[in-house]
Amino acid sequence: MDLTPKSAPEGRYVQAGDNTYYLLEMGDGRPVFFLHGGGPGCTSWSDFAVVSQMFAKTSRCIMPDLLQYGKSDKSEITGPMWDHHAGSMVDLMSELGIDRADFICNSWGGTIALALAARYPERTRSLTITGSMPVFRGPLCPLPEAGRRGRNARDIYYGGEGPTLEKMRQLMARLEWYNADLIPEETVVMRYEQSLDPEEMALAARSDSPRGEWQDLEVDLKNVECPTLFCWGLQDDFLTPDYPLMLMNMVQRGQLHLLDASSHHLQEERPEHYFHIVNSFLDQPDYKQ
């Protein structure tokens, strides 16, 4: 399958409470939010360009750039970070006239969705979570780099001589894709060019300080009531398969699917497999209970 992202559809800006989001929309049907990861240069389109077009055949795909990413607001966050993101996402849903939705998420976006589902259960019909770290411990051993692998990678990418195309390529090959030979050059360039955004570089220069207070959601996950699929790459370089197994048992209605020959961005690396797994989850009989 061709993994090269096509040109993004025309997006729009939406004011949601105190924040302005930039979002893309495709398709009609049940509303599905796609929440992207937190790596340098990530946007909704960089993470979901190929697979979202499959979902758009039957769903209304809503693809916001998360706060501090892409073309959305990049103001400093104060207070608990996941509470801030979750509350702002609910504001966005309300502004769009959406009461409840499915959420398909990678990494950073998945932790936002879990916080949202725990605090606003009436707004979530289901969650699909890939590569997210809502809990600061592993079930069997400490997390890689004490759970700071992503933050360390960001600081290395922006440090030294600053962002380069080769540093972006190496970051994606080392941490996000299982088979580096499959990474489309167009995706590398898209991420690299976005990472040069002056506001993103200003945020990165301050490391964690403008992101808000980190939150461990372990005590909150028991409040996640909706069906939740943890769809994980067997070779995820951030969190090994025992971690989503732990998460699955922390939420009320968890399921786990492991996909081989996949790492942290399996929705990009194996979009057809990812689509069929997630779409079957959304269509399963008990999903509507």
What are these regions (language model features)?
Residues 224, 230-232:
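Short beta-strand/loop motif that positions the catalytic acidic residue
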Residues 22-71:
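Conserved HGGG/HGGXW glycine-rich cap/lid loop of the alpha/beta-hydrolase fold
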Residues 254-289:
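Catalytic active-site module of serine/aspartate enzymes centered on a nucleophile-bearing elbow/loop
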Residues 114, 118, 125-163:
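Flexible "cap/lid" loop of the alpha/beta hydrolase fold
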Residues 53, 63-104, 276:
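Active-site loop/oxyanion-hole signature of alpha/beta-hydrolase fold enzymes
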Residues 235-239:
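Acidic catalytic loop of the alpha/beta-hydrolase fold
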Residues 138, 144, 161-223:
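Conserved alpha/beta-hydrolase catalytic His-Asp/Glu region
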Residues 105, 109, 113:
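Gly/Ala-rich beta-loop-alpha elbow adjacent to hydrolase catalytic centers
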